[in-house]
């Protein structure tokens, strides 16, 4: 694991402390101002605190070496954490939209002054937290999900500032639930790709590889007659696993090993596959297709 894609203990402590502070400030601010946007953001930040803890624990578990019970290691722990965080974000966003619609149907007065001050504090703290997590978020799905949690809160708080100014100047209280709805829609828009990628990895969906081109390149190796029974999946967002059956001319095992090495080098260098497993055959499966469709022969 690269250190720049992990939360250090200090970052974890700072982000958690900032989120706890924001939660308390926004909860009190929401109660005293009557702002649904602040109250919803407070609960959102509370969820963020839990997501940061979950992400940190998962990143530590992911550092564990493989063992007889987890032969591929523990990297999937971070994918599971990303999945949970993404689901939580979408559920919270849906709840906020429902509550905002209720507030639109039954408007309530909002103290724009308190709302503005609290939103400014929340925005600054959230942007600091997002900055702390930004390093490594591009290459780590777990950190990306957590980073999106915090960034969505920062944008939410910024939206609340705009809403508070409008309420303070023009007394348009209805802007409070409207801002909440807009921010919630944005959160779902940003979170959906993370959820989709996490589901694909957990379901062992094939990565974006050109399998026909891979087969064509493998068939160029002298002695390779056919390639079939291909499987490709990802352990995490960075590591691709690949297995295939290859039909070879009948020859000594000592002559097969150089073919293995050449094919492994090809797949690793050209297609960025991290782990290659090849099964050599002579007659079995010689006319089979690239992919098996038999559920009993996966």
Tell me the role of every PLM-derived stretch.
Residues 1-14, 37-39, 43, 51-298:
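Alpha-helical transmembrane segments and adjacent TM-loop junctions that form the membrane-embedded core
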Residues 28-39:
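Short, hydrophobic transmembrane alpha-helix segments
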Residues 15-25:
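The first (N-terminal) embedded transmembrane alpha-helix
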